[in-house]
Regions:
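Extended catalytic cores of very large enzyme megasubunits
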Residues: 1-282
Length: 282
């Protein structure tokens, strides 16, 4: 997984040159070499990986066209036209007949004029435990997904349901409630590269007081149906299970004066700093 959103934006002369290389390569492809994509695989190829025009219509009928585009696009980093042409042919040779299959975002994005990422997956920092922190985190997720990247987020940084929020004299709705917002944005709003819904993985650690609610909500498909919900299980938890020991569910002490400044979801770092945790139940 990658933590930085890298996008490609070939424009002007560079993009035109990659198109020229692609067309030159396509001329070398005989009709007998064109792989027909029919049935389910044809639909997947057309919907997910073939190049689309400004109206969303596929302009690539065969994998050979896709491979030539990807090869020419990847070769643009070479310093001279001669090297670019040489590496276009080398990349094409590797891709041909599915001998080498790169990530889906490379296949759909390389050699295009669009601002999309070449990375399939991103793990972004946990949201700061505040409304603004959650919204900023959501914006980052949406930005990555709009450029075709999948996103993973650990929500253990958010205080448990019912915990006091002094600034507004209220109580927290908890990470499961916020997870529904992330899920809705992914399922109903985002289209990755205009071809598919966003891909989201939401996580919570095994020590978080809301971990059981996080597990139970998976049974109700009407609530969080736009994300994969996963529990981060530690070696300590597995050892406790093996030895038949109790397991505490806890969270940082919200009364700590440095909570807002220091808490970022890393419980080990919090403890190492000499900070207290509050056990909610065992």
């Amino acid at each position: 997984m990658a933590g930085k959103n890298k996008t490609t934006k070939p424009q002007g002369k560079e993009f035109q040159f990659s198109v020229t290389l692609q067309k030159k390569l396509e001329k070398l492809i005989s009709d007998s070499e064109q792989t027909k994509m029919e049935g389910i695989r044809g639909k997947v190829f057309t919907d997910r990986y073939s190049l689309k025009d400004s109206e969303g219509k596929s302009v690539e009928e065969y994998p050979e066209q896709m491979w030539s585009r990807v090869a020419a696009g990847l070769a643009q980093v070479e310093k001279t036209p001669a090297l670019q042409e040489e590496w276009t042919k080398k990349f094409y040779s590797a891709l041909k007949d599915f001998k080498y299959v790169p990530g889906g975002r490379v296949l759909s994005g390389a050699g295009t004029p669009y601002e999309v990422t070449f990375y399939n997956c991103f793990v972004i920092p946990s949201p700061h435990d505040s409304r603004n922190g959650i919204i900023d985190n959501l914006k980052l997720m949406i930005d990555i997904m709009s450029r075709s990247g999948g996103v993973g987020i650990n929500l253990s940084s958010l205080r448990p349901r019912g915990a006091r929020v002094k600034k507004v004299n209220g109580t927290s709705s908890g990470p499961v409630n916020w997870a529904q917002l992330y899920s809705t944005a992914t399922h109903d709003v985002i289209q990755q590269g205009g071809s598919r819904r966003g891909a989201l993985m939401l996580m919570i650690n095994d020590w978080h007081p809301d971990v059981e609610e996080f597990i139970e909500v998976k049974k109700d498909l009407t609530k969080i149906n736009g994300a994969n919900l996963s529990i981060c299980v530690s070696d300590s938890f597995m050892s406790a299970v093996k030895e038949g020991k109790d397991w505490d569910l806890y969270y940082p002490d919200l009364a700590d004066p440095e909570y807002d400044k220091l808490w970022d979801g890393d419980i080990d770092k919090w403890k190492a700093a000499g900070k207290k945790v509050v056990v909610y139940r065992t």
